[in-house]
Regions:
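Residue-level signal for protein termini and structural transition zones
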Residues: 16, 29, 46-48
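Short hydrophobic alpha-helical membrane-anchoring segments
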Residues: 4, 32-41, 205, 209
Length: 222
């Protein structure tokens, strides 16, 4: 609506000189953003779980007091569906206690799965993490205590938009055989979640790849 109201002065400014170059930069930026948006949308479905995983790690996504948010419920349902087909798998649920939450996310996630029928002894509860990286790092430590090493196949359970970056972080913290289980997402959350994820992926490429020696933005595809 801004352009509709001020289109004449904007067109005049962009006709030549600095304005023209700013217009070019703007449209180039929009083009790059759209390419990255498409990359994130497609790549979330790569690296799918094979059914051979020894453990799956469900990443936290917020609570409403002590009830899983819609995003988190979808992740837990995806984990439960995998469990039904692979009943021997160990499920690590991860997440600390954030603002407005009355219990740690990991505790609420374990309760949700137990109510569905997953045995308590097959659930590993992590309840201190505050980020995706910590989710996976702390889960790795707890799984190792259970005798599941970082060299054994595992899968990250998260919403599709988040799968690529989650696989990258899993490898960053030391997991060697990483796949993912993409959960669905509500239609009202698609655009904001994918747009936000573009910037999160850029942050990872700029600030995290140097920690592992990775230089390719394609890390995490396989």
């Amino acid at each position: 609506w801004v352009y509709a109201v001020f289109h004449r002065p904007i067109d005049a400014f962009c006709a030549d000189g600095v304005g023209r170059w700013l217009k070019i930069l703007f449209f180039c930026g929009v083009g790059v953003f759209c390419l990255l948006l498409g990359f994130v949308a497609v790549i979330g479905y790569a690296g799918a779980a094979t059914g051979q995983e020894k453990a799956i790690v469900v990443l936290g996504a917020g609570l409403r007091k002590d009830v899983p948010s819609d995003l988190l419920r979808r992740r837990l349902d995806a984990a439960y569906a995998y469990y039904l087909e692979n009943p021997e798998v160990v499920i690590a649920v991860t997440g600390g206690q954030g603002n407005g939450e009355t219990i740690p996310e990991g505790v609420a996630m374990a309760r949700y799965l137990e109510e569905k029928g997953v045995p308590e002894e097959q659930i590993v509860v992590e309840q201190k993490s505050t980020s995706t990286e910590e989710n996976l790092l702390f889960a790795k430590e707890l799984l190792e205590e259970r005798g599941i090493g970082a060299d054994e196949p595992m899968a990250v359970v998260t919403n599709a938009f988040h799968c690529y970056r989650a696989r990258c972080y899993a490898r960053l913290v030391g997991f060697e055989q990483v796949s993912s289980i993409p959960a669905s997402i509500g239609l009202n959350s698609v655009l904001p979640c994918y747009m936000r994820e573009v910037f999160a992926v850029l942050y990872y490429w700029v600030f995290k790849t140097s920690q592992s020696g990775w230089i390719s933005p394609l890390v995490g595809i396989l």
